[in-house]
Structures are given as structure tokens and as C-alpha cells.
Amino acid sequence: MKSLNTLVILTSVISTSVFAGAYVENREAYNLASDQMEFMLRVGYNSDMGAGIMLTNTYTLQRDDELKHGYNEIEGWYPLFKPTDKLTIQPGGLINDKSIGSGGAVYLDVNYKFTPWFNLTVRNRYNHNNYSSTDLNGELDNNDSYEIGNYWNFIITDKFSYTFEPHYFYNVNDFNSSNGTKHHWEITNTFRYRINEHWLPYFELRWLDRNVGPYHREQNQIRIGAKYFF
């Protein structure tokens, strides 16, 4: 019974991939196609009711190149509607800033807890760039995209969890993705291990679709990170 109660508690928090309280997070990533590393530092706070906010800062580094600033971002979400103890509807949004300009996104999450050890979140998201880029016709336009994401959350034990996360992107205007088409996929496999009430390390394997130029190969990425909860 104690193990079942633990799984129920973990299911509720894994549904949004967070634990309640303030935390700091550090993550390092390596893209095998571009030979690029990314360093991320994040601070955030998650309330017991499921609302949260986080601030993110990243830097990138490529071989024979200097460390460059990636982006700054602030994101927040709120569980607006919960008609049953299994179903949650949660809007969210973010704004970001990088060297070429700013942008943002709005999204709507629908989470359903099927069992104490499995829940699914479906996310509909619109990504917008405030700056213009040159499209396929040689004209300036916003390279916006529509995104559909799924988070398949599995509670393996009271400490170990796994998330399968496929995302589909479609470019709204006349732009191609790095695979040479108007749409692409990004698939993430996340493995988490809860050491204690403070430490939550994780490991991610990602496929970011094929890059047709300049790398002409599959974009695979490895991420290693950890969260510390206060």
C-alpha cells in the first residue's frame, strides 16, 4: 500500500515533469552532427497545485570556436481547469531573447492519468519569432511554427521514471526545416533517477531529424543534467 501511494504521488508530479518547490538545474548537451555543446543553467519554482515558472540561460561551444551566448528565456504555466482527478488542462507561455532577436510561444497542455504508473500529456504550441528572416522566395517574413508534442510518462519504480517525448513541427510560412522540408520531428527519451528529496539527475537521448546542410547527417543529441530542490 505504501508503494502504491508513492507511485500515485510520483504520477501527479511526473505528469508535468516537475516536483514542488524551488530548484536550480544544470544541463550539458552535445550534438553529434554539428559537434556543438550547449550549457544550460535554470532556476525555477513549482507550486503544490501544479503552477510553475522558470528562467533559463544557455551558452554554446563548438570545436575551434569561442563560447557564445545562446538564449535567455522565461516560461510559466498554470493548471487552469481540472474537471476530474485524472484530467488537467493547463495553458502556458514563454518569451525568449537571443542575439538575432526575440520570440515567444503559447501552448495548451492536456494531461490524463490513465494508471498510477502512466500518464500522457498532449501539447499544442505556437512558436513565434519577432524578427524577420529570408524565406524560400527571397522575401522577409517571420519563421513561425506550429508544434504538437506528446509526453508519455512512465513510473518504473518509486525512484526511476522514463518519458518518451515525440514532437512534430510544421513551418507556418515559406521556410524549410534543417531536413529540407516544411516539417520535421524531434524525439526525446528522458531517464530520471530520484536520489533523495534534493537531487534529481537525468539523462536524455534525442533525435532532431536529419540535417541536409551543412552537416548532411542525422542530428543526434545527448543531454546530461541534474536538478537540486531546496
UniProtKB/Swiss-Prot annotation:
Gene Ontology annotations of biological process type: monoatomic ion transport; oligosaccharide transport
GO cellular component, one term: pore complex
Keywords: Cell outer membrane, Ion transport, Membrane, Porin, Signal, Sugar transport, Transmembrane, Transmembrane beta strand, Transport
Transmembrane portions of the chain: none
Main location: membrane
Signal peptide: 1-20
Membrane topology according to the record: Multi-pass membrane protein
Presence of the UniProt keyword Chloroplast in the record: no
Statement: the UniProt record of this protein carries the keyword Chloroplast: no
GO MF annotations in UniProt: porin activity
Subcellular location: Cell outer membrane
InterPro entries (UniProt xref): Bact_OM_Channel_sf, Oligogalacturonate-sp_porin
UniProt family annotation: Belongs to the oligogalacturonate-specific porin KdgM (TC 1.B.35) family. OmpL subfamily.
Entry protein name: Porin OmpL
Organism: Salmonella typhimurium (strain LT2 / SGSC1412 / ATCC 700720)
Gene: ompL
